[in-house]
């Protein structure tokens, strides 16, 4: 797969809704929906609070599928050594070591930023701490392989083509609670396993919880932000070259 295709997440091996790469739905069976307010309350009764969703939120149902991490790169020649060096650089936050693993034209953003020197500068700046933290979160999320191109995390290379990446997140774990309200003590609507969820309007990335809608069967609720990852979050692309594996891109967005 060409680097441009990998950056866009549009490779030929996308997972499709028919379950060609997954066999089980993403959520543990639970109640079919969050409690609904009474249709015709008595005049003297206090109306039940309206949930933060509107009908338009559910217009496009996500496929019922799970995207747990897989390592499809492990068997590639030279990958084990490359990944070990990558993991060590991330664990020690060694900007020079990461730059040494990078291609001469490593892509850093969609505005023309590139090169090992620029990568080293980004990682060494005060704002680099957030990049290092995100790279550490990527490492356990698997690796996809397509020809001579590797993609971390794995799920980025296996997204259904029908998914809107700007409005969808991945639940990063098994048994993650989908709650009726944005509270650690709120009742559980369901438990989710590496599921894709749609964001409801009013998303606030600084909040502790996000209002989401699951794939079929559709359920509405709240998931803790620390258990969600944007489909457009940072990823690492590596390419096999004559000099071994090299980081081709460290990039976020689309």
Predicted regions and their residues:
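Sec-dependent bacterial lipoprotein signal peptides
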Residues: 1-8
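Boundary regions of SH3-family modules and the immediately adjacent low-complexity/disordered segments
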Residues: 128-170, 213-254
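Short, well-ordered alpha-helical segments enriched in acidic and aromatic residues
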Residues: 94-105
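Post-signal peptide N-terminal segment of mature Sec-exported envelope proteins
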Residues: 17-59
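Bacterial signal peptide processing site
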Residues: 10-14
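Short, low-complexity N-terminal intrinsically disordered segments enriched in polar/charged residues
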Residues: 48-88, 100
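Short, charge-rich amphipathic alpha-helical segments embedded
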Residues: 106-121
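SH3/SH3-like beta-barrel superfamily modules
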Residues: 188-227
């Amino acid at each position: 797969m060409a680097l441009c295709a990998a950056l866009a997440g549009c490779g030929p091996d996308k997972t499709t809704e028919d379950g060609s790469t997954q066999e089980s739905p993403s959520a543990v069976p639970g109640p079919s929906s969050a409690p609904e307010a009474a249709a015709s309350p008595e005049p003297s009764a206090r109306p039940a609070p309206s949930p933060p969703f509107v009908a338009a939120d559910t217009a496009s149902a996500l496929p019922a599928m799970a995207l747990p991490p897989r390592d499809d790169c492990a068997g590639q020649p030279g990958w084990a050594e490359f990944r070990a060096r990558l993991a060590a650089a991330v664990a020690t936050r060694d900007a020079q070591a990461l730059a040494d693993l990078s291609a001469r034209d490593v892509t850093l953003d969609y505005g023309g930023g590139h090169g090992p020197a620029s990568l080293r500068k980004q990682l060494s700046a005060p704002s680099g701490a957030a990049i290092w933290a995100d790279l550490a979160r990527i490492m356990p999320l698997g690796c996809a392989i397509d020809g001579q191109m590797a993609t971390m995390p794995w799920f980025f290379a296996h997204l259904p083509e029908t998914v809107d990446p700007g409005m969808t997140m991945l639940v990063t774990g098994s048994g993650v609670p989908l709650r009726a309200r944005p509270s650690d003590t709120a009742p559980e609507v369901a438990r989710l396993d590496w599921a894709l969820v749609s964001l409801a309007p009013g998303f606030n990335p600084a909040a502790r919880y996000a209002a989401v809608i699951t794939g079929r069967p559709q359920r509405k609720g709240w998931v803790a932000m620390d258990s969600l990852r944007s489909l457009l979050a940072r990823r690492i692309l590596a390419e096999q070259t004559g000099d071994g594996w090299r980081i081709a891109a460290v990039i976020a967005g689309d």
